[in-house]
């Protein structure tokens, strides 16, 4: 364990060790045997997946107020189609001056290339990371929006500044990971205010 003292453990996400550790480190740790690694494969794999999920949730939690806001949230609107809600959310971002006039066209260009729907959620975004400010506009619908061949109940329109390229991938994966959980999705469908949505996100992240 003395060898670890010279390392920057703060940059570690997960630490595997073959000896007991007597100090607390700011990362997930797991002790494994150096022998019969194949028999420990499932435990190692589960540990990696759980650590990755905790990391994604941590990034979503720490970035929540940086990218989500009340003025970019709409719930149970009368809009029912993909085009209606996309145009509306694009307008919200432009009114806040987080995107320029060409943003909407690039969102549709990306959408026409292949759908951004996954099950009952959709995460549309521009073909370019040229947003003035990285932000996420959210639409929630109990009835759902017709999204190509899917019915989606949650739409996250991502506007990404190129300076946040890494954050884009992390947020993308975090949103899919969290709202792919059917029980969380069902709760989200019932959100009528930004505050309810925020509480839902935080409460489920804290359970991880």
Predicted regions and their residues:
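Cytosolic covalent-transfer regions centered on His/Cys nucleophiles
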Residues: 5-10, 14-208
């Amino acid at each position: 364990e003395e060898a670890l003292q010279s390392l920057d453990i703060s940059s570690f996400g997960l630490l595997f060790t073959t000896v007991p550790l007597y100090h607390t480190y700011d990362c997930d740790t797991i002790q494994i045997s150096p022998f019969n690694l194949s028999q420990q494969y499932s435990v190692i794999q589960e540990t990696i997946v759980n650590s990755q999920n905790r990391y994604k949730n941590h990034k979503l939690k720490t970035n929540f107020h940086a990218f989500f806001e009340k003025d970019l949230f709409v719930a149970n609107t009368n809009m029912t189609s993909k085009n209606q809600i996309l145009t509306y959310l694009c307008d919200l971002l432009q009114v806040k001056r987080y995107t320029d006039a060409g943003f909407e066209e690039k969102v549709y260009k990306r959408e026409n290339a292949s759908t951004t729907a996954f099950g009952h959620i959709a995460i549309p975004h521009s073909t370019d990371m040229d947003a003035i400010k990285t932000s996420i506009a959210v639409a929630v619908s109990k009835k759902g929006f017709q999204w190509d061949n899917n019915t989606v109940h949650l739409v996250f329109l991502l506007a990404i500044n190129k300076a946040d390229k890494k954050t884009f991938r992390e947020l993308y994966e975090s949103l899919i990971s969290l709202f792919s959980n059917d029980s969380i999705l069902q709760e989200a469908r019932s959100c009528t205010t930004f505050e309810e949505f925020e509480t839902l996100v935080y409460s489920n992240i804290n359970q991880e």
